Each structure stands twice: as C-alpha cells, then as structure tokens.
A protein has these predicted regions:
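Signature aromatic-anchored transmembrane alpha helix within multi-pass, membrane-resident enzymes
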Residues: 31-38, 211, 261-262, 388-428
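Short hydrophobic/aromatic helix or loop-helix immediately within or flanking a transmembrane segment
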Residues: 66-72, 83-109, 290-305
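Membrane-interface helix-loop-helix junctions at transmembrane boundaries of multi-pass membrane enzymes
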Residues: 202-206, 243-255, 322-350, 361-363
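Short periplasmic/luminal acceptor-recognition loop of GT-C membrane glycosyltransferases, typified by
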Residues: 450-487
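Transmembrane-helix motifs of polytopic, lipid-linked glycan transferases
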Residues: 40, 113-146, 152-154, 189
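Membrane-interface micro-motifs in multi-pass membrane enzymes
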Residues: 60, 137-198, 365-377, 460-461
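Hydrophobic/aromatic-rich transmembrane helices and adjacent perimembrane loops
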Residues: 178-186, 229-230, 310-320, 342-346, ...
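Membrane-interface alpha helices of multi-pass inner-membrane proteins
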Residues: 207-225, 233-236
Length: 562
C-alpha cells in the first residue's frame, strides 16, 4: 500500500525567534536523550545477563576472556606474539577494550562497560542511517526510529538465558568482546554509507561516502574476513539488482560495489604480513563436504534454542524479522520505492541470504556466523519505519505530529526521573550480582601460589578464566589432551623459559591419559571451588610436564615464526 500513496507534504514550520545557542541546546538535548535511552536499554540487557546463566558465557568462557588476557599481557610489557584465530581483533576490539580497562578497574566492570559502549555504538549507526534515509524528519523522529530496533533487540536479549555458546542467542553473544561485535557494527555501518554514495546531494558527499566504504571494508576485513560475506558481497549484489531495476545508474552501482570489494581485497592483502598471528587460514573453513551436516546443525540449533518458552518467543521474533525483511526488499524492488529506501532494504536482505547460503555451503557449524539474521532486520526496521511515517498521512488522512512542547517537556522530565531511578537500580544490581563478584576460584589459586614464581598448565576451557581473574602470580599455559603446548588465542611469549609445576583440572578437562599415568602422583592436591590443582613441584612430574610443553611449544613457535 505504501508505494501507492503520495508523499507527505513538507511540513510548514513556524519558528519563534531563537538564538543559535538555544537551537543548538535543543538539538543537543534531543540527541543526548537518545543516547540516554540507549544506555538505559543497555543497562536492562546487562542486568538480565548478570542474573542469568548467560553470565557464564559473558564473563568466564575461554573465548570471552581473550581481551582481558591481551590487556594484561600489554600491561605487563610482554612481547606481542599472540596466536589469534582467523580474526585478528585489531579493529576495534583490542583498542576499545584496552582504553576502557585503562580507566575502569576490574575485569567484570571493563567487560560490562565494553558491552554498553557496543550498544551505544549500534544506536549511533542506526541514528546515522535514519538521518540519511529520511533527512527532513525532525531530530525527535529520527532518534525514535533508531531507538525502536535497539528496544526490539533488548527484548530478544531478555529472552536469552542459557549458559551455552552454541545457540542462536546471539544478541547477548554480540555484547561480548570476542564474538564479532566489531564486524557486526561495520556491517550495519555500511548501510548509511551506501545510501549517501548512491543518493548524496552533492558529488563531494558521494565521493566521501565511497572513501568511507573503502576504508571501512579494508579495516573490517583486515580484522575479520567475515565482513566480505556479511557486507561487501551483499552490497555488490544489491547494486546490481538496483541497476537492473533502473533504480541506480551504472556509475554509482559500479562505484559502490567496487568500493567495498576493493576495500575488502586491500584488507585481506594487509593480513598477509600478519600471517604469523593467524592460527587458522580461510581455507580451513572451506568444508563443502559438510553441507548436510551444516544444515542439520543450524536446524537443530534453531529448535534447541526454541525449546523453552523464552527461546520460542525469540525464535518467533527472528523468523518474523527475517521473512519480513526479505519480503519488504522484494516489494521495494518490484514497486520501485525510492533508491534511498530500496537500497538499504535490499542490502539487508542480500546479507541475510548470502550469510545463510555461505554458512551452509561452506559446511560451517557455528551459530555466531549468523549475526546478520538479527542485526540486518534491525537496520531494515529503521528504513521501513521512516518510509511508513513518510507515507502515513496519505494512508490515514491525518498528519502525524509530536505533542506540544510543554507536554513533551513534562513527559521527558518524568521519563528522565524513571530512567535515572531504573538505571541506578540496574547498576546496583550488577554490582551486587553473584556473577560480578570476585572470582573465588581464581582468588583461591592466587592464595595458594602466595606470590611464588610458579607456572601451571591446563586445558583451554579450564584455565583461561583463572588467568584472567587471578593476580599477576597466576600464569597457566594451555595444553592439549596429550600434555603438549597449544597456541590458540594466547601469547607464545608465555611459553619461554617456564618450569611447569602444577596442573589445573575441572569437569571439562579431558586428557588422552590420566595425569597420574603420565606424570605420576602429585606432591599434593588442592581444591579451589570447581577446580582441582595437582601440585608436582619437586617431583618427576614437573620435569616431564615442563619438557613436553617446552619441546612442543618450541616447535610450534618456530613453525609460526613468532
């Protein structure tokens, strides 16, 4: 119906005399209100997170503590010899977390603040999208358009409650410092840039947007090649579709697609000198023979997530959002909606389709690769909401107007008081939640070490939280099931010249042979909460463990040229 309706007439504004300072103050107040609303939503998300089992994934998972471990390594002046995954985390994860940890004391607090910054960053990008899609709308309307999808994502996050990483509870996973929040923000951030590149009022604006696209693609792909699948290829496909439908001329269509593809290529080439920091090359993910397994995995993941009432609500919302985005994009193309509306809708739809096809076609089995299914519909909601408001007067015969300034001031005052009270309560709740208190097991280990110069060893999922939350005396090396060193999301510098005298175990510690069979009986056994410490100091087990780790680490370091 929307494309059949006439555009709303441009509103006739009658301005009372006001100084430039007063207008600037009003504009700033509106923008700050949007940020404050986003912060309140973020506090709601994080309050729920720290009280649910998701706190385990957020605070203590082996992957989730990567940024605290990197920050500690930099703070202690270690050489940067980190073995990352295919993701380098150089833009923006490491700089952002290090900056936050510099001013925010404690790992728990730094991770929470980082999550809040991530939500505000997402709002800022959506606010920019609203500004270029419906530039003539009032600030209040554009702020509301950007806040609405953030509120919808907040609702989804409140439905997420399990302590498992491998589910489709991706909104809370997005808030961690490890699971691709930077790539997700870059993907959404490409949308306002492509709108300006195609529909900018001046040639300078269009050229600036193209430069921005190249820079964004290069930086994002350098850090995480997933950006090419999530954004670069979808933009190129969308540009082609709009050109075929005569919604774009050839020049901007080619320029947009080329900007992102060239930027992605530049970013990928820039990764070549960083090869020694990359543990897994892209070819490792090309498992076409696992397509059937991939389909089963994602279908099972969907229904497993939907097996509780909270998950059923979230998965229903996801299904509606994804199918709605795809349907609206098709309608926009078919009905020749304005380019500034059609282009971001089609890019969002292409991102969803390309992501699903690539995830299955490459035989992947990782839910985090499906982030576009949550965040591209959120961006599409801004675009469709703006277009609906633009056409609403023709649909209803009524002009949609904001209430009078007096009513708005009173409503804002009430909202500020309510949000402030709720925010204070949320901060207190997070500060006193069990999940944010001192990690007792790490404290126990630190107390047992007692300042001695000791080094331990443990499996990836066992030892990383102890290292992140322990004091500087806690140094634990990662080992495989065969008691050999493993370089994966850790610093090779840790393995140099270490005598390994204790082993950390928990319920997730699985070895090919028991520690007693390989290392002999420990000198003593210490229990620290869920962990068991086998102390081999002064025994033959210390020599055996040290030798195996030293030899295997030296081989891996030489192989990686670290």
């Amino acid at each position: 119906v929307l494309d059949q309706l006439p555009l709303a007439p441009a509103p006739v504004r009658t301005r009372t005399p006001a100084t430039r300072a007063a207008r600037h103050l009003r504009a700033t107040s509106v923008e700050l209100a949007g940020v404050a609303g986003t912060v309140a939503l973020a506090l709601g998300i994080l309050s729920h997170l720290v009280l649910s089992q998701r706190a385990t994934v957020f605070f203590y998972s082996g992957d989730s503590v990567l940024m605290p471990l990197v920050e500690r390594s930099l703070r202690e002046g270690q050489p940067f010899e980190w073995a990352m995954s295919s993701v380098l985390f150089f833009v923006p994860e490491i700089p952002v977390y290090v900056a936050i940890a510099t001013v925010v004391p404690g790992v728990h607090a730094a991770l929470l603040v980082n999550a809040g910054v991530t939500v505000v960053g997402l709002y800022g990008i959506l606010r920019g999208l609203a500004a270029v899609v419906v530039p003539w709308f009032s600030r209040r309307t554009k702020v509301a358009l950007a806040l609405a999808p953030v509120a919808a994502l907040t609702l989804c996050s409140l439905m997420e409650h399990t302590g498992q990483r491998a589910t489709l509870e991706l909104v809370s996973l997005f808030l961690t410092t490890t699971y691709y929040y930077g790539t997700t923000l870059a993907m959404v951030g490409a949308l306002p840039l492509v709108v300006v590149a195609a529909n900018g009022r001046t040639g300078r604006a269009r050229r600036g947007a193209l430069v921005g696209l190249v820079s964004l693609a290069a930086a994002a792909t350098f850090s995480n090649p997933l950006f090419a699948m999530w954004a670069a290829v979808p933009v190129a496909i969308a540009a082609l579709l709009l050109w075929r439908r005569r919604l774009l001329t050839r020049r901007p269509a080619v320029a947009m697609g080329a900007a992102l593809l060239v930027g992605s290529l530049v970013g990928y080439v820039a990764r070549i000198p960083m090869a020694k920091y990359i543990s897994i090359q892209i070819g490792h993910y090309l498992r076409i023979d696992r397509m059937a397994l991939s389909v089963r995995y994602y279908v099972n993941d969907y229904f497993f997530t939907a097996s509780t009432w909270q998950g059923a609500i979230e998965m229903s919302l996801l299904a509606v959002a994804v199918t709605g985005t795809l349907a609206v994009a098709v309608i926009a193309l078919a009905r020749h909606w304005p380019t500034r509306i059609t282009l971001p809708l089609v890019v969002a739809a292409c991102s969803i389709v390309v992501t699903v096809v690539a995830a299955v076609g490459l035989g992947t089995t990782a839910s985090r690769y499906l982030m576009p299914l949550f965040f591209m519909p959120a961006a599409a909601a801004v675009v469709l909401g703006g277009y609906a408001l633009e056409r609403a007067p023709g649909l209803t015969g009524l002009s949609i107007r904001w209430p009078s300034r007096r009513i708005l001031v009173r409503a804002t005052a009430i909202a500020v008081v309510a949000v402030t009270a709720c925010s204070i309560g949320a901060v207190r709740l997070m500060a006193t939640a069990p999940a944010t208190q001192t990690y007792a097991s790490a404290t126990c280990l630190s107390n047992w070490i007692g300042g001695r110069d000791l080094t331990g060893a443990g499996r990836f999922w066992t030892m990383r939280a102890l290292t992140a939350y322990g004091d500087q005396s806690v140094t634990i090396l990662q080992i495989t099931a065969d008691y050999n060193a493993t370089l994966w999301l850790d610093n090779a510098a840790d393995y140099t010249g270490q005598d390994v005298s204790y082993l950390v175990l928990d319920a997730k510690s699985h070895y090919s042979r028991s520690p007693q069979a390989v290392l002999g009986d420990p000198a003593q056994t210490i229990t620290c909460g869920q962990y068991t410490i086998l102390d081999y100091l002064g025994t033959t087990g210390e020599s055996i463990l040290t030798g195996k780790i030293a030899r295997s680490a030296a081989a891996k370091i030489a192989e990686r040229h670290l």
